[in-house]
């Protein structure tokens, strides 16, 4: 432990050569831990000014309920999917008497780490988070978990820590979308994806890849690109159009990117879907505001938010063990509109 750094359950576990879960049980007077060991751990915690999350403990052991505050970290507010998840979290939390404190990471690791530190200081009873694109170090997550604060990831999960997670079926959603493009006549389908350190990017690419291979189509790396917003799509698409054998279909990681592709193709005189077909991934409001309306994969963000909030509150209230890792997958649905045949 660093000098002057706050004590965590992980530090106590290291001192006694036991697991964090055992420390947590001892601090809660669990009969599963011997009395001698419980007293030793509790005394050590007191001597080092360590106290479990005050709100979480009060919720589990008291009929007088203190303020119930859940910290929520969002990478960006402008994305329809994140706003729909937030709505699901807030409505589900409010129905059980909780409030949420929302913070924006802005896709930046430094801001995300500072938010986690702030949430710890504010004594939130739990944290729901979607990882920023820039995040490659996960110590700030682990510190919250070690301090006994339950955490649930949504959408962009972190495989570097053991925490519950709620995602949509990115793999199957992508595979079904690309399969539909192939069955609609596309033979060269470009993939516009996000950073590959994100699990959702990997899963959507794997769905794309497996759909092609299943239909005997080889992957062409020249039409697989990192592109996850409209501005990038408007820069990259003209370059792909100049290839000797340009794409006749595009699968984009989100609707914003797909719409960038759509308007670039239309500006170049291409007919959609007659000449080129496009599929996105979100089914937000923008999907029905473009012309033609966008074929896309519906993510059901509200349901993701509901599930994430439910998992977290069950842990806070002791209805689900702190150390239990829950993984829930929300099914997607292909919504066929005017950018495909």
Stretch-by-stretch model annotation:
Residues 1-66, 341:
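N-terminal helix-turn-helix DNA-binding module of bacterial transcription factors
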Residues 238-341:
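Flexible loop/turn connectors
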Residues 74-84, 102-111, 156, 165-176, ...:
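Hinge/beta->alpha junction and helix N-cap segments in small-molecule ligand-binding domains
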Residues 95-96, 147, 212-219, 242-246, ...:
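Short helix-capping segments at alpha-helix termini
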Residues 15, 20-25, 61-78, 180, ...:
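Short beta-strand segments enriched in small/hydrophobic residues
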Residues 1-7, 64-179, 183, 240-242:
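Alpha-helical recognition/docking segments in bacterial nutrient-uptake
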Residues 188, 219-223, 271-277:
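Short acidic capping loops at alpha-helix termini that bridge into adjacent secondary structure
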């Amino acid at each position: 432990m660093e000098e002057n750094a706050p004590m965590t359950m992980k530090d106590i576990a290291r001192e006694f050569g036991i697991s964090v879960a055992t420390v947590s049980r001892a601090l809660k007077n669990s009969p599963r831990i011997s009395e001698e060991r419980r007293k030793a751990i509790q005394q050590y915690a007191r001597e080092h000014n360590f106290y479990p999350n005050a709100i979480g403990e009060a919720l589990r052991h008291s009929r007088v309920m203190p303020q119930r505050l859940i910290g929520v970290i969002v990478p960006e507010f402008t994305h329809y999917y994140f706003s729909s998840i937030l709505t699901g979290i807030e409505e589900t939390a409010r129905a059980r008497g909780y409030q949420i404190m929302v913070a924006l990471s802005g896709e930046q690791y430094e801001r995300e780490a500072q938010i986690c530190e702030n949430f710890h200081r504010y004594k939130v009873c739990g944290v729901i988070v979607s990882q920023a694109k820039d995040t490659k170090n996960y110590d700030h997550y682990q510190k919250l978990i070690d301090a006994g604060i339950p955490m649930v990831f949504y959408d962009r999960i972190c495989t570097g820590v053991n925490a519950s997670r709620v995602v949509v079926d990115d793999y199957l959603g992508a595979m079904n979308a690309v399969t539909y493009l192939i069955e609609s006549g596309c033979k060269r389908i470009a993939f516009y994806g996000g950073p590959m350190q994100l699990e959702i990017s990997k899963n959507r690419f794997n769905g794309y890849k497996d759909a092609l291979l299943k239909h005997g189509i080889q992957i062409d790396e020249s039409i697989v690109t990192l592109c996850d917003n409209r501005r990038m799509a408007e820069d990259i698409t003209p370059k792909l159009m100049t290839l000797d054998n340009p794409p006749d279909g595009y699968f984009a990681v989100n609707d914003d990117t797909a719409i960038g592709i759509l308007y670039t193709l239309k500006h170049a005189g291409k007919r959609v879907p007659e000449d080129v077909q496009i599929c996105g991934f979100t089914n937000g409001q923008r999907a029905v505001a473009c012309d033609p309306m966008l074929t896309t994969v519906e993510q059901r963000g509200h349901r993701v938010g509901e599930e994430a909030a439910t998992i977290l509150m069950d842990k806070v209230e002791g209805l689900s063990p702190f150390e239990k890792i829950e993984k829930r997958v929300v099914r997607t649905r292909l919504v066929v509109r005017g950018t495909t045949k």
